[in-house]
């Protein structure tokens, strides 16, 4: 029966809680029976900024809950996306690690990634000694992840031009069992891919109107293995560079439920990842045309990535003409990347121990206010959602260094003396910006008969103020060749979206959506500059960059039949002034990196996923099959060349069996060769172009078993056939000989994904 907004509105989390209680009750009864062949209704929050059934939203959203995170042994972003075509994450073999999400060929800082509504920092690149990525979240604090494909600027602003990844952290009600006031969740796990151990504990309690939660977790591991087995040095090395890694995470919450519908909560979160890295692949460098100049006799690094957040949130109901429900939150977050590099450096005129330090920090305050009002107008039911967000970001960065003579040679008169040639005064590659953003948004979900119409719009005003710090003026004279253009830059934009869904008969739903998006240039792209003549490259600013703009069209059809389902989506995205932050101008002596606007670009594609209950075809109850396929095609309309951010065709197919107490699945991943590559920016020593990844097929076997009540064992064997393969996102900036400009050359075998590996975890809910 059709459910309207007024008579069946759920306050946030009630839908998810209902599903959870149903699941717990089912597990308690008939534990040995086959699992019911019914797909429980999933919900989404990110698609409309309010909890809605997934089938009612006019966009494509993947929802991964806590149970699936455990069953799939998700230890990082790449594990999360293992069986999710159309979304990927690269960074294998790189010092800075996983570099964030790629959704339908749009990646990097164009994907809004948020934790409880607070955006995590952008990535930053400033040469081999300064690289920050966007992996600031540990999966253990997450109760669900939502992956929203396509532009969402009308709800989330500039950062969401390519999609939204929303992490929602654990709350006390996720740990406490029905009828209990004290609960705990203990977990331990191991992954052979990086020889990593996990220890995690979450405690929750409730007394009267108050509840609390405390989570502590730690990971200890090493480098993620490649398929290569040569443990030498330099470009000949095919094994991963050695690492010792430790990640710790703390989450604390306290809440006051002063009525059934009103809640005031405090949150503290701290993430810290520390890695010691022996960069054996850099020994003998720098490299050019495959030949090392033998200046780096050794190179080691220590990288620390941290994020700390404090927040207060208030949800309350009221009966007024303005709103039925209001929620507001105020958060402060500080995120840092500190990198230290120590190298035995032997150029032609000295022998020194050289140290390089880099620091990147984003500090932000975010105030978010959202209201909703349900009302009826003639034959239509409305859910009006509107609000505002005010955000201030302060971005700082610096680098410094020194050198100590190791022996008397050339300019080094005595061992232990300071090397003036290697002294680097505190400098910065960009003028530290303050970014102030003011947003207003409104959305109306209108239900009429079987139709739901969802118009929405958001107005964004952004002001970027660069600051001429001493560190920046040490790098460049503001009155010289690359001035900081006219100080403050401002942008404003109205982003509309219109979506529609039609429910045919409770089984089929069709939808369509038109959305506009935009993204403002970063301070680094506008003003950032860096020069490394010895390595043969420079990074130049482009103060004339225009904001990116997009228009997106999507249509799809969904079907639900008990334990079977399917979803198909077609999309077509147009981009204007698309910013290529890795644009390269090739030179005879050195290469120049400079952000450039691509005037016109298009991305189009199709995605399909489905699940079939094989019991309907005569198989034993509990058997099912599933499959998903994603295809995208991107084109730079200015040059006619492909967009290198597009992943090749990929599909994941599986056969599974589920009972209440145990289950398992065999998954088959297929990826086609990457045949559409723009090689115009590559200058390979052998005259070739970019490295094109070959196709591959992988088998994964996973299973879970409830040992006793509330204790579950999850295990998986991945790349079962031990295949050698490359993921396109890991190698797309490399040419056929393994050189990436002059920044991070690598033997391509060192960038391969792990061979056969396994992961296991044990979860105990008390």
Model-derived features: positions:
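Gram-negative outer-membrane beta-barrel transporters
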Residues: 30-31, 379, 385, 447-453, ...
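Acidic, small-polar-rich N-terminal luminal/periplasmic segments of exported/outer-membrane proteins
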Residues: 32-179, 281, 555, 724
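C-terminal beta-signal and adjacent terminal beta-strands/loops
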Residues: 123, 518, 571-576, 672-678, ...
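Short loop/turn motifs that connect adjacent beta-strands in outer-membrane beta-barrel proteins
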Residues: 156, 172-182, 209, 261, ...
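Periplasmic-side early beta-strands and strand-to-turn transitions of outer-membrane beta-barrels
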Residues: 173, 181-185, 191, 198, ...
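Outer-membrane beta-barrel domain signature, strongest for Gram-negative TonB-dependent receptors
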Residues: 239, 245-395, 565-567
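Outer-membrane beta-barrel signature, preferentially recognizing the C-terminal barrel domain
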Residues: 291-319, 429-435, 484-495, 499, ...
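Signature of Gram-negative outer-membrane beta-barrel scaffolds
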Residues: 381-505, 531
